[in-house]
C-alpha cells in the first residue's frame, strides 16, 4: 500500500494557494515528498481564471475590487471560478505512479474517483459526467467564462448537475489536479465580476449556469460543514487510490519555495498576461 501525505492548510490568499500547489509539485518532482492530497480554502474570496483565459476581456476588475475579492491566474486550464464557500482540493502525484493512466482524461477519472467516493460517504449520489451531444457542443464552444456551466468528461455531478470543477496541469513529470467542491453557490456574485456583451447576455448565461451547477447546501437542504467534507474526501481518496493517507505539514523547503513563488502569482505579468 502506497503512503500519501495529507495536508490541511486552512484558508489562504490567492497567491499563497497557487504558490503552495506549485511548490508541492516541485518538491514531489525532486523526490523530496510523497504524493500529496491538500485540502484548503480561500481568504479573501477569490476569482481564479484558467491559464489560457483572457483576463482583460473576461473579468470586470472594477467589480472585483469593489467587492474586495482576490484574483489569480491558475497554472491549470479551465474557466473562471469564484472561490468562496467551498472546499478546494489539490492532488500532486507522479505521472509514473502505479495505475495512473497516461492520458489527461483517464487520469482525471482515476484521481476524481476519490471525489466520488468521498461525496458518497456524505450521502450524495455522485457519479462521473459523460456529456451527451449537446454537452459536447457546449464544451467545444463554451457559452461563458464561468466554470460549472457544463460538466466535462469525468467531472463529478449529482442529480445531473455539476458539483465539482477540476483542472489539471503536468510539469516535470508530475500531475497537479485541483478543484472546488461547492458548499454553497452564489451565481449573482460570480456573474457580477465577469464581463459580458450586455446585461441581457449576462442574465441568459446566468440562468444556464444555474441549470447546470449545484452546491452541497442545495442538495442537502441545509449547510454542510467544510470539516465534514474534508474528512469524507480524505477517506474517499484513500479508498480510491488504495493508499494510506498520513497527516503531514509542508516542509521547510516547500514553504521557502512557496514564499518565492508568491511573487509570481502576485505579478501583473502573470495574472494579466493574456
UniProtKB/Swiss-Prot annotation:
Known pathway: Protein modification; protein lipoylation via endogenous pathway; protein N(6)-(lipoyl)lysine from octanoyl-[acyl-carrier-protein]
Entries under InterPro entries matching the protein: aa-tRNA-synth_II/BPL/LPL (IPR045864), BPL_LPL_catalytic (IPR004143), LipM (IPR024898), Octanoyltrans_LipM/LipL (IPR050664)
Catalyses which reaction(s): octanoyl-[ACP] + L-lysyl-[protein] = N(6)-octanoyl-L-lysyl-[protein] + holo-[ACP] + H(+)
Active site per database record: 147 (acyl-thioester intermediate)
Keywords: Acyltransferase, Transferase
A single BP term in Gene Ontology: lipoate biosynthetic process
CDD domains: LplA
Highest taxon above the source species: Bacteria
Residues carrying the site annotation Lowers pKa of active site Cys: 162
Short name of any one Pfam family annotated for the protein: LplA-B_cat
EC number(s) stated in the UniProt entry for this protein: 2.3.1.181
Transmembrane segments: none
Chain ranges of the BPL/LPL catalytic domain: 31-245
Leading EC class: transferase
Subunit composition and interactions: Monomer.
Note, other: In the reaction, the free carboxyl group of octanoic acid is attached via an amide linkage to the epsilon-amino group of a specific lysine residue of lipoyl domains of lipoate-dependent enzymes. The reaction proceeds via an octanoyl-thioester enzyme intermediate.
Family: Belongs to the octanoyltransferase LipM family.
Name of the protein described by the UniProt record: Octanoyltransferase LipM
Amino acid at each position: 500500500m502506497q503512503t500519501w501525505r495529507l495536508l490541511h492548510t486552512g484558508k489562504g490568499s490567492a497567491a499563497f494557494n497557487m504558490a503552495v500547489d506549485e511548490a508541492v509539485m516541485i518538491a514531489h518532482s525532486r523526490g523530496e515528498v510523497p504524493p500529496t492530497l491538500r485540502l484548503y480554502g480561500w481568504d479573501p474570496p477569490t476569482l481564479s481564471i484558467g491559464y489560457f483565459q483572457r483576463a482583460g476581456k473576461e473579468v470586470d476588475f472594477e467589480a472585483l475590487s469593489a467587492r474586495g475579492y482576490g484574483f489569480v491566474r491558475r497554472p491549470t486550464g479551465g474557466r473562471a471560478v469564484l472561490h468562496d464557500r467551498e472546499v478546494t482540493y489539490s492532488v500532486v502525484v507522479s505521472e509514473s505512479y502505479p495505475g495512473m493512466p497516461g492520458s489527461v482524461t483517464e487520469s482525471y477519472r482515476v484521481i476524481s474517483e476519490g471525489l466520488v467516493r468521498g461525496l458518497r460517504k456524505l450521502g450524495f449520489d455522485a457519479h462521473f459526467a459523460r456529456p451527451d451531444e449537446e454537452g459536447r457542443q457546449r464544451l467545444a464552444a463554451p457559452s461563458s467564462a464561468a466554470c460549472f456551466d457544463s460538466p466535462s468528461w469525468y467531472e463529478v455531478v449529482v442529480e445531473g448537475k455539476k458539483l465539482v470543477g477540476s483542472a489539471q496541469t503536468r510539469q516535470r513529470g508530475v500531475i497537479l489536479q485541483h478543484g472546488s467542491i461547492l458548499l454553497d453557490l452564489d451565481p449573482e456574485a460570480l456573474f457580477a465580476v465577469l464581463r459580458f456583451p450586455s446585461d441581457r447576455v449576462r442574465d441568459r448565461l446566468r440562468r444556464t449556469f444555474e441549470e447546470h451547477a449545484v452546491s452541497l447546501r442545495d442538495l442537502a437542504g441545509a449547510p454542510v460543514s467544510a470539516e465534514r467534507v474534508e474528512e469524507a474526501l480524505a477517506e474517499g481518496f484513500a479508498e480510491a487510490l488504495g493508499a494510506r493517507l498520513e497527516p503531514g505539514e509542508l516542509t521547510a523547503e516547500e514553504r521557502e519555495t512557496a514564499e518565492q513563488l508568491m511573487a509570481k502569482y502576485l505579478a501583473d505579468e502573470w495574472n494579466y498576461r493574456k
